[in-house]
Amino acid sequence: MASDPATDYQVDVAPAMSRRGGEERPAAGLGPWRLGLRRLRRNKVAIAFGIVFLLLVGSAIAAPLWANHVAHTTPFENHLSDTIEQDGETVNVVSFDGVPIGPTYQAEFFLGADPNGRDVMVRLLYGARNSLMIGVAAALITTLLSIVLGLVAGYFRGWVDGVISRAFDVMWSFPVIILGVALGVSLQLGGLQLGPINIAGDSLLIPTLVIGLVYVPYMARPLRGQVLSMREKEFVEAARAQGAGPLRIMFSEILPNLASTILVFSTLLVANAVLLEAALSFLGAGVRPPEPSWGNIIREGVNRVSTAPHIAIVPGAMLTLTVLALNVFGDGVRDALDPRAKVRVEH
């Protein structure tokens, strides 16, 4: 389902420029963020896909409204023995042969039912909530850890950088999907104890933490490289001369200069995290049934693809659209903040 994530990122930082007469010139009166926003507004494709993503988020947020006031069911309720009126006829939600009803395009079972008699539309919307929530939360965890580790490794260098870099090398030696499955299955079986906090194996926090951890090297290393180049800049030397300590220099002087890079990586990380969550759930190492996720809904539909193809096709299409929208919008943000920047993904 999912390909390996980025194994090589290149980020080149360029000053904000405007084009005049075929030459790149500084945009007078505009800061880099305002200039970036202006560039982004001109990128109609990126804006369109950004709107698509917002619509997907809105549909996920509205899942309880659809379930409670339209479909009148829950993502866990089965209707194996129920019937429904369709085209003037009374039909079983699930036939005696175990074949679920297809899309009715009406309030109940709008996209049909699954083999357990559950409403596919309701589960799709709740699955979107879980998949997007895990993707965003995991990207946030990755971003926070990457910022701290990248700053510490790049600023202190020496043995500190060596220890952190070797840990990244170990994680980088495993394909992300393999590392994610190994961690996911292990934590599902035994849960996770964080001091007084006990996280159950079937909690949504488990795949969130797993995905958040496995992507750290792919963001932290580029940040480390930029910190290494910035620590010798004049503004850092000036801060040292004024008596600023390492923490102040890292978080007050260097970190603001990494903001555009962090924003670009974070946007693309959400797409990778959503895709990896679906892959882990499909393989049984992510969100555990009966809790819905696009990945486990697709898994349930694979065995019924000949009799009920909608169960696998619809969530697959939603997953594809979400990842495409995030990637296109992320590319637009990258181009807007720095037209010469490269965030390259090599497999």
Model-derived features with residue positions:
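Gly/Trp-centered helix-boundary motif
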Residues: 1-147, 151-152, 159, 177, ...
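Transmembrane alpha-helices
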Residues: 129-145, 228, 247-279, 321, ...
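Glycine-rich helix-loop "coupling/hinge" segments at transmembrane-helix boundaries
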Residues: 183-187, 198-199, 211, 268-269, ...
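Short hydrophobic alpha-helical segments within the ABC transporter permease transmembrane module
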Residues: 120-127, 167, 223, 227, ...
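Hydrophobic alpha-helical transmembrane segments of integral membrane proteins
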Residues: 60, 171-172, 213-214, 252-253, ...
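Amphipathic alpha-helical segments that mediate coupling or scaffolding at interfaces
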Residues: 39, 124-127, 131, 152, ...
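Short helix-to-coil transition segments within interhelical loops
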Residues: 113-118, 155-156, 238-255, 298
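Generic hydrophobic transmembrane alpha-helix motif, especially the helices
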Residues: 110, 114, 136, 141-155, ...
